[in-house]
């Protein structure tokens, strides 16, 4: 009876020992894509950054910003939030603009949408960590600025991302991918960002 009692007391702890690492693993993966810079600040930096991209030339009609969302609620909220923040600006690099929120299907499909819409800026919401390298491959050769919402995104292949360092917002630039996507940033601007090569 005593052994049975001890066993029943141990069961909840055993379950916790088994379940807790799984929960923590899930938290770790979720944290990898956490947005640390507020969307309002991100929008402000995107607008400012566009002024320093020498290849972001005016095209007929408004400048198209594709906002790519995943299947999660957090991704959809991010998409609507950044679209709203960007719409508060009259122009991006002197040109009127339109934001289009689209669902991610595949890297190849995104390339087709960029070409079809003549998009010059692509914003990647959370949920794209695994797909960013293939997205980077597909966007290579196009003239498009890809912006990742999370700090990990530039290291995986977006041209730009955002982070917090010593309490300050930091703009991350993947210089190699910038060259692949014909993003030509002024050298003076590169002095104030963290360059990822």
Region spans (language model):
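Short hydrophobic alpha-helices and adjacent helix-cap/hinge residues
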Residues: 2-7, 11-16, 25-197
């Amino acid at each position: 009876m005593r052994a049975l009692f001890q066993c029943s007391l141990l069961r909840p702890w055993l379950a916790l020992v088994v379940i807790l690492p799984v929960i923590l693993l899930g938290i770790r993966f979720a944290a990898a894509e956490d947005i640390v810079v507020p969307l309002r600040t991100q929008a402000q930096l995107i607008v400012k950054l566009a002024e320093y991209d020498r290849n972001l030339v005016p095209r007929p009609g408004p400048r198209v910003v594709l906002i790519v969302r995943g299947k999660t609620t957090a991704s959809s909220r991010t998409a609507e939030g950044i679209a709203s923040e960007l719409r508060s600006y009259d122009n991006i690099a002197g040109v009127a603009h339109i934001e289009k929120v689209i669902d991610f299907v595949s890297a190849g499909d995104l390339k087709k949408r960029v070409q079809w819409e003549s998009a010059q800026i692509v914003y990647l919401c959370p949920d794209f960590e695994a797909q960013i390298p293939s997205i980077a491959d597909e966007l290579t050769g196009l003239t498009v600025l890809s912006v990742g919402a999370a700090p990990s995104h530039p290291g995986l292949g977006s041209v730009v991302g955002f982070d917090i360092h010593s309490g300050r917002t930091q703009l991350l630039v993947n210089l190699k991918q910038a060259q692949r996507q014909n993003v030509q940033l002024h050298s003076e601007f590169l002095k104030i960002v963290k360059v990822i090569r």
